[in-house]
Amino acid sequence: MAKRSGSNTTTPTDEAVASERAHEVASRLRLAVARLHRTLRQHADSGLSPSQLSALVAIERHGSMTLGELAAHESVAPPTITGVVARLEADGNVAREPDAVDRRVVRVTATPQGRAVVVRTRERKDAWLTQRVAELGADDLERLADALQVIEALGERVDR
């Protein structure tokens, strides 16, 4: 809360201004992150649709997953994830395997080819972003590094 100069009290106006500023900054941050995400996705050049790449990255990161687990992780309906996995499987990026404990359950795992797609995609995104960051002046680079500390802290608060 903002305090009046020389006072231990805040005014409704101070709180409203602070709240409005927080909303403005949050909106700009959300838009900037979305724009950067979209641009990185365009430079990934993975040959996969965004939903296929997202599912493949989730499988590669979390290991073997059931279709239900993957659908929940991706926040999509099971029939949607079934189609995504079918395409990934047809392209050789994932394999379906019976669960070791319950043979009725099918698990999806990334193939070596699928893992290579994820690695290659990350490398392309990192290379593009590294080039953009390297073009910044020294002052902007330091401001970005400082801002990242705040952004990372925001992310940690959300994860709690």
Give the ranges of each region predicted by the language model.
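N-terminal leader segment of winged-helix/HTH proteins
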Residues: 1-50
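Charged, amphipathic alpha-helical coiled-coil/dimerization segments
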Residues: 2-3, 86-146
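Alpha-helical structural segments
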Residues: 35, 60-61, 72-73, 120, ...
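N-terminal helix-turn-helix DNA-binding core of bacterial DNA-binding proteins
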Residues: 39-80, 91-93, 107
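DNA-binding alpha-helical recognition surfaces that contact promoter or target DNA
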Residues: 83
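Exposed, interaction-prone assembly regions rather than primary DNA-binding/catalytic cores
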Residues: 142-160
